[in-house]
Amino acid sequence: MFKFPTPPGYEKEPVWTGRDFQIGSEKVAILKYTQCNAGWDADLTEFHEKEAEAGNHYIDRASRLYACRELEKSEKDQNTVILEIGSSSGYLLREIKISFPESYLIGSDCIPEPLEKISEKMPGIPLIQFDLVNCPLPDNCVDVVVALNVLEHIKDDEAALKQIYRILKPGGHAIIEVPANSQLYDFYDEQLKHFRRYDSRGLKQMSLGCGFVLSKSTHLGFCIYPAFKLIKLQNKRKNKHLDSNQKQITIKTQIRFGGPIVNRILFTVMLFELYLGKTMPYPWGIRCALTLKKPHGPITR
C-alpha cells in the first residue's frame, strides 16, 4: 500500500480507503500540502476547460494519446504507481485509469479547486495537492510520473525536475511534454502564465543534468507546425498594439480556430503523425516530448 506523508495540521498518517483518506477519525477527499499558484490558478483551469472544448482540443487529445502510448512501455503490473502531476480537469487521469486499471494511479495539482471537482467525478483515485518544487512525497516511491504542460508554469523548472527524479524509483520513467520553441514566446504564453517555452536541446541537457537517462525525444504537432509558427510570429508583432482585453479575445479565437470540423480534421492529422512517430522522432513541432528514465545506479559520462 502506498504511504502518503502526513499533511500539515495533522498528527496521524493518512490512509487511502478506496474512496477518501482517513486521517485519525477524520475523512478528507484530498490531501493538501504546499500550495503555489504563481504559474496557474483556478480561473485558468476554467478558461482552458471552456475554450478548449472540454478536453476535446486536437493537440490536447493527441498529447494524452501519446502519453498513454508511452505509459504502455513502462507500465508493468498492478503494483505500478503512476503519478500524474498537473491533473487539472482530470481528462488524462480518466484515460490512464481506463487503459491501466491494475495500476495504482494518483492525481495531483498545485491548487485544490480542480482536484475537488475530480474527486466528485472520479472518487476512486487518490488526489493530492502540492507545489512540485516542495514535493512532500518520499524518495523512490513512484514508478512513473506523467507531467504534461507543467514545467512551463513553474519558475524554477530545474528544481521541479529534480523533485521528479527524487521521487521516482530506480528504473522509473518520467513522461514530459512542454511548449516548444523559446523564440515563439508571446502574449498567448503570458496570458496562460507560461514562464517560458522550450527548445528540445536545452530541455534534454537540463534533464541529463538532473540525473536522467534519455529514453525518447520527439515533438508533437510536426505537420501543423509551419502554420502554428506563423500565427505565433504574428502575435509577437501585434503585442505592442493590443490591450489586455484584445489579447484575451485573440487567444479565445486562436484556441477555437476553425470550430469543431477543423478540430476533427487536425486531430486526424495528429493521429497520422503519431502513427509515423512510432518509428521516427520529429525534429520540431508545437510541443517537446521527452521520456526520461531514472537509472538503477550511477551514470558514467
Could you say what each language-model-derived stretch is?
Residues 112, 154-158, 178:
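A structural helix-start
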Residues 2-24, 52, 224-301:
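A C-terminal cap/extension of S-adenosyl-L-methionine-dependent methyltransferases
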Residues 158-173:
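A short glycine-rich, Lys/Arg-flanked "PGG" loop and its adjoining helix->strand segment in the class I
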Residues 212-222:
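Conserved S-adenosyl-L-methionine
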Residues 149-153:
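A short His-aromatic
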Residues 174-196, 200-205:
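Short, glycine-/aromatic-enriched active-site segment of Class I SAM-dependent methyltransferases
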Residues 1-138, 144-148, 161, 283-288, ...:
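Conserved N-terminal segment of class I S-adenosyl-L-methionine
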